[in-house]
Amino acid sequence: MLLKTILNSIEKYKGFVYKDIKLTGEPSNLMLEILIEPRRNSRGVCRGCSDLCSGYDTQSIRRYEYIPLWGIAVFFLYRPRRLNCPECGIHVEQVPWAVGKHRLTQRYAWFLSRWAKRLSWKETAKAFGTSWHHVYRSVEMAVDWGLKHRSLEGVKSIGVDEIAWRKGHKYQTLVYQIDTHCKRLLWIGDERTEDTLYGFFNMFGKKRSAQLEYVCSDMWKAYLNVIAERASQAIHILDRFHIVAHLNKAIDQVRAAEARQMKEDGYDPLLTNTRWLLLKNPENLTEKQEIKLKELVQYNLKSVRSYLLKEDFQRLWQYSSKYWAGKFIDKWCTRTMRSKIDPMKKVAKMIRGHKELMLNWFEANGQLSSGVVEGFNNKAKLTMRKAYGYKSPNLLKISLYHTLGDLPMPKTTHRFF
């Protein structure tokens, strides 16, 4: 089967014909050059108004990069016509295989964008013999198209969280859909202020916001304020992973301070290399760590008492009754306040202040898993590590939408993989 026959089967453009096909270059750097010409008496499409117009003259040959075949670079060669449009004046025609002045064919751009989900942008460019900039433009095109064509209807549950993308407290606010039938990134905004989250609800619209049933977030005050105002009808659930993170942070502070004090007082370094013993869940400890932890808990140390308070708090999630869960929180907070361990007392005060929101976990009755938000954040961090960081928030947004947004793509007859 001739290559021209294959192209006419999968890449047939109305008003254009494939002419000469040449294999050029050195054996180590072969290229297929495919000459395209307009059909006789055909008219071009005006880039301004999309009307069919007569040709005015032609420009020099442009090269458009197409999907490589058998490891050989493929280029479309075409002389764009300048059109004499009654409405727009003289303009260069819009060709159907590329957008604007881009030298990548649309088919190749979609091809690169799909592979950029599996590989880093740098590796994608290297694998297909193109530039990082071409991969970036392809992903940007795919994200723009996907955001314009996605549906936001039927969203009942959302999760709000933030990630640090640069040093110096540079944050991005991320909003996810966490419904059982659909989990995806919905929106990204700069910083983590009230205005940031207002931006999401303004985009989402009042009607859709009023249909939300569950909202999951951490205890960041700006988020709490906006959610209470814009989605007051929804059950607002505090992310249990962030609550446990506050407990772990307090334990780490207690351990570090106590270890320094013991060293200054000349005691045995009992707390050396014990950080992960106290922070890990018991089921994740190695056999060696389990033995060391059993030895450590025999000592009446503040670090040990903090650890035991944290492990006792985990019993909260086993309750099925909102009433008895509230009683448990009250007793735990009272006991923690009497422990005279300042970092743990600080956490107890925070939990008391957010008790009602915490109890919404039980009102949801297992309908929502906040672990989905944490899972998405881990994927977002993995995306950033794979890219070795981002120079601008816009690059980060494009990459995260592309990876986590579950954005639609145009239907094609072939995908080349």
Regions found by a protein language model. Name each.
Residues M1-I90:
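Short, conserved DNA-binding cores of transcription-related domains
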Residues R43, G48, S54, K167-H169, ...:
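Acidic/histidine-rich catalytic cores and adjacent linkers
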Residues S50-C53, S60-H169, S209-A210:
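Short, positively charged, Gly/Tyr-enriched micro-motifs
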Residues K101-W110, W187-D190, R338, K345-K346, ...:
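Acidic, glycine-enriched active-site microenvironments
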Residues S131, A142-G146, M219, A234, ...:
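The DNA-recognition helices of helix-turn-helix-type DNA-binding domains
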Residues H134, S138-C216, K221-V226:
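RNase H-like nuclease fold core
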Residues L174-V175, E229-A234, I251-A256:
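Short secondary-structure boundary/capping segments
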Residues I243-E264:
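Short alpha-helix plus adjacent loop in nuclease-associated cores
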